[in-house]
Amino acid sequence: MQDRFLKSIAKLPEPLATAIVPLLDKDFAGHIDAQQLAELQAASKMELNELLLALLPIAAALARPPISQFHVGAIAKGKSGDIYMGANIELPGEALFHSVHAEQSAISHAWLSGESIIEDIIVNASPCGHCRQFINELVDGGKVNIHLPDQATAPLSHYLPYAFGPSDLDVTEPLLSKQQQTLTLDSNDPMIIEGLDHAGLSYAPYTKAYASVVLETKDGATYCGRYAENAAFNPSMQPMQMALSTMARHNRDFSEINRAVLIESSKGVISLVGAAMDALHSVAAVELEHIVVEPE
């Protein structure tokens, strides 16, 4: 079991703790599939909602909050039945807008894993306005059920009435819809090829700044992030932050980064290079490779 979960395990009911320990091996990064979840439910004899709330300390152990020292975990449950954990991240010395909220982390985890619909968000405190707006960008976002301790489950529309969202800006394929922009570049570099794939799947209906980030560690592992825009603009999730969140979930130190690539479309009305460089340089002494691609 990874050391970062030692304190969290102590907070779980004993039957659940015993059942989940085998999952928390060196490769665990916050994903529990539907079959594993069913096995945890059977072993713990807990109702599903009770079980998901009980797992929040495990999600919170994924957090990296050097500024606030406040660990927040969230869980997104997809239509597949799989659950995806996420946690907050803060970048040392950088402005707070560089932070990743736990709900953003969990949703991006599900998105990167191929989920097309998120049905439930489980979190230990009421989602802030920023996160409510981010959830509202999803396919059927207003219908996403929010689960909180000691409160009745309610859809996002209860927490964000009279919401402003993608439909108000004539966007008919919101976040988690299948996106496929064709971005090509003649390259045999595996990192660039991976980045092109993710940039093509990014979500940027408002600026057309389709983009992705790929981070490589010294052992050759890669971690990706895609741009995820928001109708309210400010809650948009940057690809660098998503990639760093992915690294954190996989228990990798940012000091292990030895290469970083940002790929973005030439047709975007904005560029993400400045924001990506600031975020990267707060955690790693690595130059950002910036590649601008003509979309087909």
UniProtKB/Swiss-Prot annotation:
Q: Which PROSITE patterns does the record match to this protein?
A: CYT_DCMP_DEAMINASES_1 (PS00903), CYT_DCMP_DEAMINASES_2 (PS51747)
Q: What's an example of a GO molecular-function annotation for this chain? A: identical protein binding
SUPFAM superfamilies the UniProt entry points to: Cytidine deaminase-like (SSF53927)
Entry's EC annotation: 3.5.4.5
Residues that, per the record, bind Zn(2+): 101, 128, 131
Catalyzes what?
A: cytidine + H2O + H(+) = uridine + NH4(+); 2'-deoxycytidine + H2O + H(+) = 2'-deoxyuridine + NH4(+)
Task: Could you list this entry's UniProt keywords, alphabetically sorted.
Answer: Hydrolase, Metal-binding, Zinc
Q: Which residues form the active site?
A: 103
Positions binding substrate in this chain are 88-90
Single Gene Ontology BP annotation: cytidine deamination
Record's keyword annotation contains Hydrolase? yes
Any one GO cellular component localisation term in the record = cytosol
- Segments forming domain CMP/dCMP-type deaminase: 47-167, 186-296
Function, in words: This enzyme scavenges exogenous and endogenous cytidine and 2'-deoxycytidine for UMP synthesis.
Q: Which family does it belong to?
A: Belongs to the cytidine and deoxycytidylate deaminase family.
Q: What is this protein called?
A: Cytidine deaminase
